[in-house]
Amino acid sequence: MTQSREVLNLLTLQTPSPSGGPRPCRRYQLRTPREGCGTVMEMMVAQRDHLRVSHVSPFAVSLQAPDRWERCRHGAPRFRLALGKGEYGRVEAVSKHECVKTFNEVVAFYHELVVCDLIEIARLRSRCPEKSEGLISFVDACMPCKQLFFPRYSCSLNDFSHWGPENIPPLVAGFESLLDAVVFLNEECGLFHSDISPCNILVERAQTETGLGKLVLTDMGLATPHTGNPQTGVSFVSSGGTQLYQMFVDRGPFMVSKDAYKPACVLLRCFRVAAALNWGEVKTDRFPICQQMSRVIDVSCLGYCLLNVIERILDVTKAEPTNRFYSRCSFTELQPQYFLKCLVHKVVLLEFLADLWKVEGGGLSIGVSSGAEFDSERLSLSERQDFRSWCRQLDTRYICTLYPYSNLLEGCEGLRDCLVNLLSLDYFSPFGRKSLES
């Protein structure tokens, strides 16, 4: 295989079909709701307030907005409480139970609006809508104001700080629900989230001040259709038929997930491509992601979010050893070593947990050891030496700050099993553990 062909394969986030060619598009049929979900007439009435198909071609579909979105119906709120802001715009509480997300750019607004409503339509048609409880509900939209309305939550998982033993059982239950949500997003919505991190997981208010409430996946601003859909091209049109937005669907490994939560299979692709090409060439080649790779990446990102929480449980002194380790990193995304270094905290902490919990059979192995043994990749001597040195440096930090509190995790079989399950698809090979089966 030529180098250019190999790089193209790495940039294409698709698993090979049994024949070796591209995977065919999978076609879904609308399923009637399960008993107890209402009659077909009720479903049709409910769908009146959602997107509808206005045009279909072999490769694309046009989705039309309902009339209600195009009218401003909400009025001025009685109060506004700022909850967050970013490049997209701002989020404000407008009541005790509701918040509004106001966008600066119409493109970002249309994108998230379409994705959120596709999820709501999937709930309407699902036989198991309870599997979507870990996905944020979309309440309403106002196109003139570029606003989306959502339920209000207490904080993000990134900001939650009460990590006592009493919150470990609800943590496990929360991540099991998030796993159901990601599978629902993948199989029933036909969507790839692509940006799962603790910042994008919200915490519902619990019965006590320090309790951990229900966890919900949010921020669909980068979610896109995968190739399991009959059409991947999606355009959004007004109720009058005017095209408002053409959804982006092409994805590449460099623009998938925040680096701290990038799965090992994605980091390998980034490492190989960055070593073979210059950055300008890399950024131009992107392709739609297949359903299997979408699942591998989103589920694995959930696993690394849970790993982050486990570190915070152990970090009793708030030393933040991982953040401090990476704050001294001198590499940039232009260098392949950067992506190797993004593996270090995953490898070191997973090795420690595998030993602590007596995990057998490589259940927490991602194909890389802190001794710089790579199961499916040949590195140069200097690269292996650097990786081994980085692992020793971080392990030294953990010895001082995390490991003395390992008793907090003893007996946490549910937490162990949840982490093993979430990381069961990831491996330092192009397609995750699937590569090992080929």
Swiss-Prot record:
* Stored InterPro entries: Kinase-like_dom_sf (IPR011009), Prot_kinase_dom (IPR000719), Tyr_kinase_AS (IPR008266)
Q: GO: which molecular function terms? A: ATP binding; protein kinase activity
Q: Which domain of life is it from?
A: Viruses
SUPFAM superfamilies on file: Protein kinase-like (PK-like)
Per UniProt, residues of the Protein kinase domain are: 77-340
Family under the similarity heading? Belongs to the protein kinase superfamily. Tyr protein kinase family.
Please state what the annotation says regarding this protein's domains.
Answer: The protein kinase domain is predicted to be catalytically inactive.
Q: What is this protein called?
A: Probable inactive protein kinase 38
Taxonomic lineage of the native organism: Viruses, Duplodnaviria, Heunggongvirae, Peploviricota, Herviviricetes
